[in-house]
């Protein structure tokens, strides 16, 4: 299991959308390798996920055509290709409590939607088979360490990439988190289940 970050956009946010459509699976990995997703804590139709329907099927072809070969699990899709794929664009309407899953090869991005339209809060989730060869003992040790430290990771449970302690604030230090002021949740009754997932 990964310990993905969260996404929070307040209702008053007036940021404008940009094209940053991407695939979260490396060009040199063409098969279904990972389902990623989120649990939505708010209902959203404006500030939501945008997917490009069935693009997981052209993942290999797309990166070959663009002559892109790498092992990075985050690759931007060319802006002109995104515009040309407009008929495949699906802006998801997501009710509160929904679990949304997609193949990591799928071209996708979040959008802000109409200014000052709605609050958005989601918790990202991702699971991969525990018995995979890339899920080494070292990865398990790291996952336990980061779980105890309450750190978040990338979408991929392995190889594990830990995120910074502070959220992306784009220079606004007033949005930094003072972790000493937070109340720790008591999750003792869930620990055996958590240990099994880790």
Predicted regions and their residues:
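A short, hydrophobic secondary-structure junction motif
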Residues: 27, 90, 131-134
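Non-heme Fe(II)/2-oxoglutarate
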Residues: 101, 105-198
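Conserved double-stranded beta-helix
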Residues: 1-52, 56
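Double-stranded beta-helix
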Residues: 34, 44-109
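Short, solvent-exposed aromatic-acidic interface loops
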Residues: 8, 54-57, 143-150
